[in-house]
């Protein structure tokens, strides 16, 4: 006759096998053979970005009517002033520039030109 410890171990093994068999049949009945989780769906792509429409933007803003009407003209005038400033800076005499801008923090004429061009690139 086997000892009590051996009987307990055999009973535990049989019990575990029964539970595993029961679990297997429950998963096959549900249509999921095995225990794999369902596959993860692929991520949905983001919606396409809407192209910027300046006229639509101006309609939505709460600017004054005069600003809405004239902003294009003012932008063109500002662009013309900036471009003429660049041309003026390129044609400016170095000695006249240094005489007019002493103590303004410019090391040389080329330094001032480079700073101004960097400023124009930013804005």
From Swiss-Prot:
Listed GO CC annotations: host cell membrane; membrane; virion component
Residue spans crossing the bilayer: 5-25
Q: Supply the alphabetized keyword list.
A: Host membrane, Late protein, Membrane, Transmembrane, Transmembrane helix, Virion
Localized where?
Host membrane; Virion
* Membrane protein topology class: Single-pass membrane protein
Q: What induces it?
A: Expressed in the late phase of the viral replicative cycle.
Give the family this protein belongs to, as stated in its UniProt record. Belongs to the asfivirus CP123L family.
Its recorded name reads: Uncharacterized protein CP123L
Give the species: African swine fever virus (isolate Pig/Kenya/KEN-50/1950)
């Amino acid at each position: 006759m086997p000892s009590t410890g051996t009987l307990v171990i055999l009973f535990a093994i049989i019990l575990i096998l029964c539970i595993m068999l029961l679990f297997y049949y429950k998963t096959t009945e549900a249509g999921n053979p095995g225990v794999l989780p369902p596959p993860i769906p692929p991520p949905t792509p983001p919606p396409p970005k809407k192209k910027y429409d300046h006229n639509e933007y101006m309609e939505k803003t709460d600017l004054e009517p005069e600003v809405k009407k004239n902003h294009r003209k003012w932008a063109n005038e500002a662009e013309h002033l900036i471009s003429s400033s660049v041309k003026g800076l390129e044609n400016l005499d170095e000695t006249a520039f240094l005489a007019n801008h002493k103590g303004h923090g410019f090391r040389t004429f080329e330094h001032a030109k480079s700073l101004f061009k960097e400023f124009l690139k930013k804005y």
